[in-house]
Regions:
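Active-site recognition of the HExxH zinc-binding catalytic motif
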Residues: 1-11, 64
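Post-HEXXH active-site segment of zinc metalloproteases
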Residues: 7-38
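Active-site-adjacent bridging/hinge elements
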Residues: 32-45, 96-97
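Long C-terminal interaction/binding lobes of large macromolecular proteins
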Residues: 51
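Pan-zinc metallopeptidase signature
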Residues: 54-162
């Protein structure tokens, strides 16, 4: 789905240069990039700059993976809001981090508050799953660069809403 929205919202827009600065130049040969990924795997530093190993294969895949994760994040936050789920945990420095039950991820202009809600919620969900002997519901670590890319996706979507 991310590929479709890249064509619709980024390809011919004034954001394509910002996209290239953040994700890389999508004009690089796509098939060659995928062949290289399947032959050699992801670069060693993929975790510093991409949301998944596959995202490191080509800028289009980086966008598509980021877009998919963005949908996971806002959909999960919306579901938790619908059910009134709230979380709160004390951090090592004594600060309290929590997710509010009435948070509207679609209504915020900046992506920062979304991550602020997402982090404690996924920590709680992953902890519950582990308590039940299951794998994490969201086993991904979001690097600062990945969060920046998710923020870009958020802005593109907000700027193009109807």
């Amino acid at each position: 789905i991310g590929h479709y929205y890249w064509d619709l919202l980024v390809r011919d827009s004034d954001r394509v240069e910002a996209f290239r600065e953040l994700f890389g130049d999508e004009r690089a040969d796509y098939q060659q990039a995928l062949d290289n990924y399947y032959a050699n795997g992801a670069p060693e530093d993929w975790q510093d700059r991409c949301i998944s190993a596959y995202a490191a294969s080509h800028p289009w895949e980086d966008w598509a993976e980021s877009f998919a994760h963005y949908l996971h994040i806002v959909d999960t936050l919306e579901t938790s809001e619908h059910f009134g789920i709230t979380t709160e945990r004390r951090l090592p420095d004594g600060a309290v981090q929590g997710a509010a039950p009435d948070f509207d991820s679609y209504g915020v202009a900046d992506f920062g508050p979304i991550i602020d809600q997402w982090a404690p919620l996924t920590f709680a969900l992953n902890s519950i799953n582990r308590s039940m002997g299951q794998t994490d519901t969201y086993p991904f670590v979001l690097s600062p660069k990945s969060i920046e890319k998710l923020g870009f996706v958020h802005q593109v979507i907000r700027d193009n809403r109807l």
